[in-house]
Amino acid sequence: MSEFRIHHDVNELLSLLRIHGGDGAEVYIDLLQKNRTPYVTTTVSAHSAKVKIAEFSRTPEDFLKKYDELKSKNTRNLDPLVYLLSKLTEDKETLQFLQQNAKERAELAASAATSNTTSFSIPVAASKMSTQELEELRKQLGSVSTGSTLQQSLELTRKMLRDKQNKKNSGQPLPVFPAWVYERPTLAGDFLIGSGLSSDTVLPIGTLPLASQESAVVEDLLYVLVGVDGRYITAQPLAGRQNRTFLVDPNLDLSIRELVNRILPVAASYSTVTRFIEEKSSFEYGQVNHALAAAMRTLVKEYLILVTQLEQLHRQGLLSLQKLWFYIQPAMRTIDILASLATSVDKGECVGGSTLSLLHDRSFNYTGDSQAQELCLYLTKAASAPYFEILEKWIYRGIIHDPYSEFMVEEHELRKEKIQEDYNDKYWDQRYTVLPQQIPSFLQKVAGKILSTGKYLNVVRECGHDVTCPVAKEIIYTLKERAYVEQIEKAFNYASKVLLDFLMEEKELVAHLRSIKRYFLMDQGDFFVHFMDLTEEELRKPVEDIILTRLEALLELALRMSTANTDPFKDDLKIELMPHDLITQLLRVLAIETKQEKAMTHADPTELTLSGLEAFSFDYMVKWPLSLIINRKALTRYQMLFRHMFYCKHVERQLCSVWISNKTAKQHALHSAKWFAGAFTLRQRMLNFVQNIQYYMMFEVMEPTWHILEKNLKSASNIDDVLGHHTSFLDNCLKDCMLTNPELLKVFSKLMSVCVMFTNCMQKFTQSMKLDSELGRLTLDQGSVQGPPTETERIEDRPRKELTRKHLSEHVDAPQLASGFEATINNFDKNFSAHLLDLLARLSVYSTSDCEHGMASVISRLDFNGFYAERLERLSAERSQKAAPQVPVPRGPSAPAPRVAIPAQ
């Protein structure tokens, strides 16, 4: 079960139980994920669970009847559900809550139904019920249908199956039998009600002597055994899908009638088998049922040969009723098993794999009865032949030819090109899916390998390569599952190797991943220096004013000027301007299932005020079949990491530019040195923070994780392992870079915002000082109109220049300006320190409680000398002191004052 399936089921369960508030779905999801254990079904555990529920139930007979009915329909996951219900019977508190909840829901439903009835004078539900819904309702209520209604039900079933199959095979509709096949009852081979032998010359059997009665009854039985009414034994009309019953002349001798009643079940079973063969021979029921019906028809022919031989004996006067009973014994067992199988298939509405599951289970259950097991093995082997033919095409060639929707793997129409466009497209997961109800029970353990084998070969085929499995052999059903399991495993190993070699060697998957790492994870240092220098001015503009073609040209120039020019895949790198900033994107992704962040998706959009820096991201063009691994989801993760690191690099460049521009301020070394020192110190703290964060992400997160990925890719045995390793690499990078934790992400974004605002403030102040200095320089350096100043003029102008410099310095050190600037710097220092302490405190909590040991490295880097740890301890002590209640001083006799020795004078 995938993570999102667990999210969906937990949310649906909370909704059904009407649980609001509390711990929220996330707590229960986490518990389920940590405590999942596979349920292994055994006969003993299933039986004990069934007995426990039956003992607990008020109507155990109804429960056992329903259980047997579901079991006969081969319902999936029935035993795990029964086991869960048996566990619930032991938990009294949970059971009481569920009973109370069910009672409240029933009352709410009743009140809603009452309100609807009073609101409308004419009920409209009945008028909207279609014929199909009416038939389904009758089936659920177990109402008895007449023969004509049964025929309509069969026609409706065939129509439903035909519509489903034609919808899947839109290009090639399935053939159908002409209508007269179903309209002419004489073609069915079963009893025709009311068409028995002529009764004009029938003598009352009670008037005949005993020997004549026996002879007449034997003749009637020979007719009845082949589906024709006799003179004294006639078939009754069918009531629904019940077994055939017969009416025996009541005047028949009692001893003869008793023996006749023992033989008649053979005729009833023959009628059931004949109807099953004729019904399942229709195209709509699939090849497995066709093969089963054909195998049954072969056995029925042998049965008819036996009846013919008995008729020959009767004509010779050598067949008595006792001999008939003796000769029919072997056939009775065979026909009874065939009828039982036919009834089970009909009741379970089995098609394809579900039919094979039923036959396999029945063969396994007849382990002690060799003849019955041999019969079931014959039927199962015959019925499985078309299924194994589909299976062989799938695991040996990667082709599905399943016109009747019988195979365990279902194909969906998805375009592989959409992997590049649609984030939610799941080509690899949804192009081919497993249908649990169509998995034969003897292939349950290898269903995943069967799915993967065909998928691997199908990918290679779609790339234009012919695939021929060298280990291909015919698969034949046997109770020894190891025979065809080994064949499936050989095909799986071959398909895995073919696709893996194709992607790794011919399509150069690892080289593409290295190219993506070079650009998205900033592995190419000189390229980014060139690129950010070239695009700095353009990226400062709002998104609406940026010319994308200009950015593409600058990207091309930076690629050609750096060592990235040797990258063979550099032309696949593109530029994309995202519609929202990184924080909004990440919070939306993280808010899929959490109630706390759901409100953020409805907040006022900030996309209109985005700058190029906030919207900038790289994109990468990936072609099929590499897009199976480097799909849109993976590229989105790469983009998140890149935008995070790119913005950190931008903040670092801004702080470095502040350091360069601050050299001008060092000329004014009077009073300004006192309050400029605070700004310089804060800038260095910010720069130290940003650089350490970058170093941590690049060299302590991405590089080790990348080396693990490369090692895992070398040892991967199939493409699913490659996909899992790549996804794990990206998930670990996102987690360790603090991009999956909303709380850490918010604090980090606040720190980045403080750094950017500080650099903007310092740049404005430095620019103002530069303008004043430039104006003073022009005032000091201007000469006479006649030419440059002479030596005498320089000596005379020296006092004036010193006076001007003093005036500029005093202007910079003006008390009003100094106090305002100092307050601004103190405010920045206060905000930065508060957010950084908050980040360190949260990192400390997560590194200990969630076992995120990698985050401890960030703490040691940012707080290498314990400076922030002391401040955190001080803040914690102050908070605990404020939160501590004031303890009143108990009143009592005052303690004597301590004596202090006073030294002698």
Curated annotation (Swiss-Prot):
InterPro entries: GCP, GCP_C, GCP_C_sf, GCP_N. GO terms for biological process: brain development; microtubule nucleation; neuron migration. It is found in: Cytoplasm, Cytoskeleton, Microtubule organizing center, Centrosome. Component of the gamma-tubulin ring complex (gTuRC) consisting of TUBGCP2, TUBGCP3, TUBGCP4, TUBGCP5 and TUBGCP6 and gamma-tubulin TUBG1 or TUBG2. TUBGCP2, TUBGCP3, TUBGCP4, TUBGCP5 and TUBGCP6 assemble in a 5:5:2:1:1 stoichiometry; each is associated with a gamma-tubulin, thereby arranging 14 gamma-tubulins in a helical manner. Gamma-tubulin at the first position is blocked by TUBGCP3 at the last position, allowing 13 protafilaments to grow into a microtubule. One of its GO terms (molecular function) is gamma-tubulin binding. Keywords: Cytoplasm, Cytoskeleton, Microtubule, Phosphoprotein. The modification Phosphotyrosine is found at Y83. This is Gamma-tubulin complex component 2. Belongs to the TUBGCP family. Residues 877-905 are annotated as: Disordered. Residues 887-896 have a biased composition (Pro residues). GO terms for cellular component: centrosome; ciliary basal body; cytoplasm; microtubule; microtubule organizing center; nucleoplasm; spindle pole. Pfam families: GCP_C_terminal, GCP_N_terminal. Disulfide bonds: none annotated. Component of the gamma-tubulin ring complex (gTuRC) which mediates microtubule nucleation. The gTuRC regulates the minus-end nucleation of alpha-beta tubulin heterodimers that grow into microtubule protafilaments, a critical step in centrosome duplication and spindle formation. Plays a role in neuronal migration.
